[in-house]
Structure formats: structure tokens, C-alpha cells
Regions:
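Condensing-enzyme catalytic core mediating Claisen C-C bond formation in acyl metabolism
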Residues: 1-50, 149-214, 218-221, 252-271, ...
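Conserved beta-ketoacyl condensing-enzyme motif
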Residues: 17, 51-110, 225-240
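Short, well-ordered amphipathic alpha-helical segments that serve as non-catalytic structural scaffolds
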Residues: 55-71, 119, 203-218, 285-290
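Acidic, glycine-rich active-site loops and adjacent beta-strand->loop/helix elements
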Residues: 83-88, 110-111, 135-144, 187-189, ...
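Short glycine/threonine-rich loop-to-helix capping motif typified by GTGT followed
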Residues: 93-96, 234-249, 314-321
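Cofactor- and metal-binding active-site motifs of prokaryotic enzymes
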Residues: 95-102, 121, 141-159, 316-319
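Active-site-proximal alpha-helical scaffold in enzymes
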Residues: 106-134, 172, 277-298
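Internal helix-turn-beta structural module
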Residues: 282-283, 289-320
């Protein structure tokens, strides 16, 4: 691997995304991408007594499904990078505690899936034959931790987003047919002073812009190089902000840009306000939809930029601003 510019790594032997899996909740199952997910749940509990246990089960079963589909024995997977939104990443650690694979828990808020793929790609090129990457989120457990108990029935402002209930997992390998992770661009923390916890899109968009521009400068590429430029969960408001900010900086991304939070729900038929969010948003949309687009040869080059708001309930209550982060990976056939 070699360093390009300030924040980008180019892989000499690009790691392969061998196989993926995705499981989503009932609201996502009623969205426009439902047919692309491996499994759609009928309710948020999935036979468990708590939402937290349900989320742990979701990531556990998603990981097992990805391993099974890949044809790689779990004994041959050398590292697992996984994370979620709950305190101490309990969904990942509890869900994967019986996996018997070296576990590296990570937290990047909603950027966690691409953060995991980035770290997994580095270690795959460096020394490992197979690596597992996963992320999850759950609407009910996230609302309980970050906002208000669902029983209160609080009204949600139009700028708020709906945390995706779901998990996505990917098995990376040293060799295979592709798609390949050719570059990663790790993001910097960007804080523009946004304090509204119900407008995460506005808080994260500047970080997405910073990483996007850095990627283009480091690689010498233009937006037109990619068939699709996809952000993780900026939602409708954040997507519009990023498009305008990029245009102001001389980058026209209107023709090939979309956001996972915009794609996963139907704006007219589902009441999700500004769209989807959460670790599971980017993870399920990539693992469910975009991976199949690669396999069907409908796209050949994808820039996936997962965005995260590095905040919690305490800092919001104390009036702190919301730092944003965005990590990007270039995936190509």
C-alpha cells in the first residue's frame, strides 16, 4: 500500500469484498430497497425481550449469514471489526461474543461500517487472508439512548431522521473476483458549530465535503470518474447541503450523487421526515443494494462515504456542538 496526499491510501493488492449480508427491520422491509436485503424482520423484537437484545441478535445473524455465503470457514477469518451506536458497543460485543474470532470493536457513529471496511482493508493487505466487518443500529434502542423513550410519544421535527433497524456485514479477502477496495480516505473531525441534535444532516455534511474534496485532490480524480458517489446518512437536508457546498468548491456531483438515508425509505409513503440514519443505514444499503449492482455489472466504480455525528445525549444536553466525521472508500470492479 502507498500513501497518497494527506489522507488517502492506495492498495497495491486491493482487498476483495468476497461476500456480504444484510438483515433489516419491518419499516425498512416496507421501503423501496426491500427486495435487495437478505432477510426482513416482521417486528423490532425478533423474539427477544429487549431492543438491545434484538439488535445483538440482528448483527449476530447477519455476520453468520455473511460467513456462510462467503464459503470461508469462520476458523479462517483472522479479525473482526464491528461497531454500533449503543454505549460501549454492546450490540456488537454481546452479539459476537461466541464468534471466536479476534474482535476489534470500533466506534465512528454512523460512519462505523466504512471505518471498519477501511481498517479491514489495511489489515487484509498487510497480513490477513480473511477479515470480517460489520455494523448495526436499531431505531428503538437508539431513540431510547439518544433522544426520548418511545413511550413518551415525543413529536419529531421535520429535520430529524429515522434510525435504521438493521445490520450489514462483509467478508474481505486477499484474492477473488471483486469488487475491490482500491483506495480509502480517512476523514478528519469537522465541527461547524451545529448544535441541533434533530438536524444531524447539517452537522455531518461539512465533514462529508472535507473528505470528498480530500479524496479528489489526493487521487487526482474528478466526480465523473465514479458511476455513483454515495454518502451514508445525510438524509434529504444533508444531501442538499453537501451538493451545494461541493458546487461552491467547484465539484459538480448532482448527476451521480445519492445518499443511503434518502434511498432506504419512501419519502411519500413512510413518515421518516429527513430520511434514514444510523450505522445500519450505510451498512444495509451497501450490503443489500450496491453489492448486487456490482455483481450484476450495473456499476463499476463507487465512492462510498459514510458519515457520523460524534455526539451523545450528555453533550447535547450540555449545549455542545456536534462534531462530524466522514470516511470514504473507493470500490471498483
Amino acid at each position: 500500500m502507498q500513501k497518497l496526499g494527506k489522507q488517502t491510501i492506495k492498495f497495491d493488492t486491493p482487498p476483495v469484498i468476497t461476500e456480504v449480508a444484510s438483515i433489516v427491520g419491518p419499516k425498512e422491509a416496507n421501503g423501496p430497497l426491500a427486495k435487495y436485503f437478505d432477510q426482513c424482520l416482521e417486528d423490532e423484537f425478533w423474539g427477544e425481550k429487549t431492543w438491545e437484545k434484538s439488535e445483538s441478535k440482528i448483527i449476530k445473524e447477519t455476520v453468520n449469514m455473511a460467513i456462510s455465503k462467503s464459503g470461508v470457514s469462520s476458523n479462517d477469518i483472522e479479525y473482526c471489526f464491528a461497531g454500533d451506536l449503543l454505549n460501549q458497543c454492546i450490540s456488537s460485543s454481546f452479539g459476537l461474543r461466541e464468534l471466536n474470532i479476534p474482535f476489534i470493536g470500533i466506534f465512528g457513529a454512523c460512519s462505523t461500517f466504512v471505518e471498519g471496511l477501511s481498517l479491514g482493508a489495511i489489515i487484509t493487505e498487510a497480513c490477513a487472508k480473511h477479515v470480517l466487518c460489520a455494523a448495526s443500529s436499531h431505531f428503538c434502542s437508539a431513540e431510547k439512548q439518544f433522544r426520548f423513550p418511545l413511550e413518551l410519544g415525543n413529536q419529531r421535527p421535520p429535520s430529524s431522521q429515522w434510525t435504521v433497524t438493521g445490520s450489514g456485514a462483509a467478508v474481505l479477502s486477499k484474492s477473488g473476483e471483486g469488487p475491490f477496495i482500491t483506495h480509502i480516505t480517512s476523514g478528519k473531525i469537522v465541527d461547524m458549530g451545529i448544535k441541533d441534535a434533530n438536524n444531524m444532516g447539517a452537522a455531518m455534511a461539512p465533514a462529508a465535503l472535507d473528505t470528498l474534496i480530500c479524496h479528489f485532490k489526493d487521487t487526482g480524480r474528478a466526480p465523473s470518474y465514479y458511476d455513483a458517489i454515495i454518502t451514508g446518512d445525510l438524509g434529504y437536508i444533508g444531501k442538499e447541503i453537501l451538493t451545494e457546498l461541493a458546487q461552491d468548491k467547484g465539484y459538480n456531483i448532482k448527476s451521480n450523487y445519492n445518499d443511503c438515508g434518502v434511498m432506504i425509505f419512501d419519502k411519500e409513503l413512510q413518515d421518516t421526515h429527513s430520511g434514514g440514519s444510523g450505522c445500519g443505514c450505510c451498512a444495509t444499503v451497501f450490503s443489500g443494494y450496491f453489492f448486487k449492482q456490482f455483481k450484476d455489472k450495473k456499476i463499476k466504480r463507487l465512492l462510498l462515504i459514510a458519515t457520523g455525528a460524534l455526539t451523545n445525549a450528555t453533550t447535547s444536553q450540555q449545549g455542545e456542538s456536534i462534531p462530524g466525521i466522514a470516511h470514504a472508500i473507493s470500490i471498483e470492479m
